[in-house]
């Protein structure tokens, strides 16, 4: 009897020290007492009550209405106001104040290297109850930026190119931050996020109650973060490169035994990397990130196809855009070695055919799970296979004519063909043009000699 009394007292003292329950039911003392009474009767249910308390706190924080700074209509460019105030607009259901409000955590990882929107080491946090993904300053302890989980539209986990040690970039693309779809007037926009984790176990990852996780179980930091995100995302799942979609013809520059999933490209003068994924085409890792979701792509075509490089043109239409509202992105100086792989990817998903754009929008690849990826790839492959042999032959003939027109310039006098962004590309174009000129001269000479022979025989 005395042992039972001591055990019950210890349990009661332990339960009274649970911070999550104290915070969640501070305004409801009678309900808090009932929770502690239940824990005293069934101490094995302490984790359950703690989770319920954390979820309750997250709901209270989410529905709180902290004061917001008013936004003047003529204060300045919309993009600048969004950067300064994190898109805080009167009347929004979510605000930056909500993101920064105190809330119980489900997971956090210290010393995470962020590249976007700030380049510094911060603490990555996931609040309980599918609340927010955010980054906290490790010195001031203030939340620097964040995004509600239900506003995230795409999450990518991509190997960092050209590194001697394996690393992974997590790219968070919220709604209206993909570089394609502009927000409606007055709509709040959250910034994209990019952070890096190394290959190997997590060194400073913790659950919400402060218990270290990711050590001793063989789970890498990349797998741990990916699992936590998948458990909390509501509209999507983490997407990774898949060699069934695309793999580069060239291996990793510093790890020759590993396959590379990226292609180097330029958008204007800005260098970046293209990733061809199961849900769309990504260009990063510098601001602004661009994600070409399948449902936004009107068509994909090639330009300036030279001996060593070519350009990729992607025509897109926003979700809320009309039929004629399209925008074209040119990604240049792509290595010819990856032409076959990229072309196979484009045809697999029917991206070269603008007539399939409506079908892609109707399909809306909105769930990125493994089964959805395979089904989507199979559907797009079937659509691409419907192209008739006549259409295929006509398209190939037109492509060949376009290449001949680009490569042959009888009045060039050594001027560079194509985009002109690289001297090497210009030299390649000249060399190829010289080869074509030489080939045409040989054909003309051969035909001329045959005509002379016929004339002599007739005489």
UniProtKB/Swiss-Prot annotation:
Localization: Nucleus; Chromosome
UniProt feature, compositional bias: Acidic residues: 398-416, 424-440, 449-459
Region Disordered, residue ranges: 64-96, 370-459
Alphabetical UniProt keywords: Chaperone, Chromosome, DNA-binding, Nucleus, Transcription, Transcription regulation
Single annotated GO MF: DNA binding
InterPro entries tied to this protein: PH-like_dom_sf (IPR011993), RTT106/SPT16-like_middle_dom (IPR013719), RTT106/SSRP1_HistChap/FACT (IPR050454)
Function: Histones H3 and H4 chaperone involved in the nucleosome formation and heterochromatin silencing. Required for the deposition of H3K56ac-carrying H3-H4 complex onto newly-replicated DNA. Plays a role in the transcriptional regulation of the cell-cycle dependent histone genes by creating a repressive structure at the core histone gene promoter.
Record family assignment: Belongs to the RTT106 family.
Subunit architecture: Interacts with histones H3 and H4.
Protein name per UniProt: Histone chaperone rtt106
Organism encoding this protein: Neosartorya fischeri (strain ATCC 1020 / DSM 3700 / CBS 544.65 / FGSC A1164 / JCM 1740 / NRRL 181 / WB 181) (Aspergillus fischerianus)
